[in-house]
Amino acid sequence: MKVRKARHFILIVLMTAITAASVPCTASYADTGSSFEYKYYKDPEMYGRALQRSMAGVYDDFNGRTFDDKTIPIPGLVETCIRTEGEDSTSKQYVPQGLCRADHYLLVTAYDVRKKHNSVIYVVDMNGMELVSTLTMPNKFHAGGIAFDGENIWMTGETSDKYKGDPFVQYLPYETFLSHLDEPVSEVKEPELSRYIYIKNKPSFLEYDEGVLWVGTYAGRKNTKDSYMYGYDIIGEPGNRRLNTLMYSIIAGLDSSAQGADIAGDYLYVSSSYNSTSRLKTSFITKYNLKSSQTGTGDYLVEGHETNRVEVPKMNEEIIVDDSTVYINFESGASYWRLALMNTDRVLAVDLSLWGRRR
């Protein structure tokens, strides 16, 4: 009897250990490291019909103005594979956030809404239109912003309400980034990142343009123009970059719900969104004339210099303006937002001409 009890106890311990252990990535995603498929709508026609039912006005504007050959599934919505301390695990709870282009790679950031797993960067090779790796970061940051300056990949730091320290950003050297792409799942260690680079405003989203890292701050109040961006010059030698935070430029007058921005020539494009279920118009990409909004101090006040405002599907996040295309990332495809008015499970590629002909 005692022997049976001992064996039973050992069995319970073993089962508990197995349950607690990391679950390896699903076999079907062994090559990509995370899912890379459309979660809700398997083809553009299905997505179009859903958009027409939920947001008819947006459908009318977008119909015939999206590029199906440039649109990609948002990685990791079905399953994200994570590697922490050498152990692989999976999650279905990741929420997409940031978006940027680094050479021919498209980078999409995401965080685990339950804060159980570390944040990730999905890496998509736009030449082959395939997911090549999922990089697990050494933190659980919201990962709201990412930008590439040609040498380093910049990322937003801690932004949670619990964090009481100074705001900061970090970067990952591009050469280090490339070294992680040989594996479908890879783990970025803390020493591979730069030190914390402290700045003057909360880093909600990022944009790089002509030697300046623009850091946007989400204000979150409806129907106001309280969001803004600070532009910090990137200085220092390669491998030891820092930001000049003593002197910085300001872009003010953005929608308070700003989620992302991109500068293209003389124009600023701002992605703003609030409210996931309302049928009111709450999600936009707005084009501003930067040149005409410059003040006597060299800063910019874009309020009053709006040239085009286009309603887009709900819960838009960071954007890229690239040649003739606007790429839009969304968080509404995440399981956490399954009750959203419209679940967009793709990085939409939209014709830039929707915002007027000139960049």
Please place each PLM-identified region on the residue numbering.
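Structural motif
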Residues: 115-122, 161-177, 221-233, 277-290, ...
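Structural signature of eukaryotic scaffold interfaces centered on beta-propeller domains
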Residues: 89-102, 144-149, 153-154, 160, ...
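Surface loop/turn motifs at the tips and blade-to-blade linkers of beta-strand repeat domains
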Residues: 87-91, 134-139, 194-199, 249-254, ...
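Asp-box/WD-like beta-propeller blade repeats and closely related beta-sheet repeat scaffolds
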Residues: 175-210
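Beta-strand-rich domains and repeat architectures in extracellular enzymes and scaffolds
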Residues: 74-117
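Sequence/structural signature of beta-propeller modules
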Residues: 7-14, 22-87, 346-359
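Residue position within the beta-strands of beta-propeller blades
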Residues: 108-109, 155, 215, 270, ...
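Loop/turn-rich, solvent-exposed surfaces of beta-rich toroidal or solenoidal domains
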Residues: 250-300, 317
